[in-house]
Design a protein with these regions (language model features):
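Bacterial Sec-dependent signal peptides at the C-terminal "C-region" and cleavage site
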Residues: 18-24
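Gly/Pro-enriched, hydrophobic low-complexity segments
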Residues: 32, 83, 94-96, 104-108, ...
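Positively charged n-region of N-terminal signal peptides that target proteins for export
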Residues: 1-6
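Short amphipathic beta-strand and strand-loop transition segments with alternating hydrophobic
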Residues: 66-69, 148-154, 208-209
Length: 260
């Protein structure tokens, strides 16, 4: 009888390990397909309205321009330029995303007339007072996470994979992200962010998807809600343009002060 129990425990252990490997394999497969479907966009530009809501519902808005260049050997390059209001006009944020480790990020502050490097230890902090962290602004490279497929689930009438993304970088402000990805177009619709104590921190919802150049899906609205503070930030995108001729020289930290 004792031998039978030992055999049963061993068999159950093999089944558990097998299910974990299957979950991780399917999670990586889904995340890889998400990545593949967005390859080849080249570069993009867009305009954006960022609206910040405090816990009482009071709001302030900012007008922003965005530029992104698709990466080859490393991750994407992105540039964010603030146009209004006057107190942030001319502020520019530059990110060179890395496929492993922390990203290279710089912030130009016109009031100080200097470019400030964002230390890797500070990339979990809030971006320009919003509910988005600096690490949220960078492109989400495939190599930055390990993955676990959790289940299939309906989300607003769409059949979705639910996948856990676990950051490899220990300096990330998140212990994990739970992502809802539709099974037809492989678009992200919702992300739950958990803090380092495994508590739900924020939820990001993507709305109003449109397709460009017959292939590239972009959501026009990002809503990030902070469950621990009651604050919220909404990003509304407009005027998407693809393959505009941007190059790496347009994403140089030395020229941040001259960005127009």
């Amino acid at each position: 009888m004792k031998s039978f129990r030992i055999i049963l425990i061993v068999l159950l252990s093999y089944l558990f390990v097998g299910s974990v490997y299957a979950s991780e394999g399917k999670g990586l497969e889904i995340a890889t397909e998400v990545d593949i479907r967005d390859r080849g966009f080249g570069d993009t530009t867009s305009t954006m309205t960022m609206t910040l809501f405090d816990q009482y519902g009071n709001s302030t808005s900012r007008k922003i321009r965005n530029r992104t260049l698709e990466g080859t050997d490393e991750g994407d390059l992105s540039l964010v330029i603030f146009d209004t209001p006057a107190d942030v006009k001319g502020t520019a944020f530059l990110s060179h995303t890395k496929k492993s480790g922390s990203d290279d990020q710089w912030l130009y502050l016109p009031a100080l007339k200097r470019v400030k490097r964002i230390a890797s230890s500070n990339q979990a902090g809030p971006f320009m007072g919003s509910e988005f962290a600096y690490e949220d602004i960078s492109s989400q490279e495939l190599e930055k996470y390990t993955y676990k497929y959790l289940r299939n689930e309906d989300y607003q009438g769409l059949d979705c994979f639910v996948v856990e993304y676990d950051p490899i970088d220990r300096k990330s402000g998140y212990s994990k992200q739970i992502v809802w990805i539709d099974t037809k177009e492989y678009r992200s619709h919702k992300i739950e962010f958990y803090d380092r104590k495994e508590s739900l921190l924020k939820t990001l919802v993507y709305k109003n998807y449109s397709i460009y150049n017959g292939k590239f899906w972009r959501a026009d609205i990002f809503e990030m809600e902070n469950h621990q503070t009651g604050k919220k930030t909404i990003l509304e995108f407009d005027d998407w343009k693809f393959q505009t001729g941007l190059s790496a020289k347009d994403f140089n930290k030395k020229s941040l002060k001259k960005v127009r």
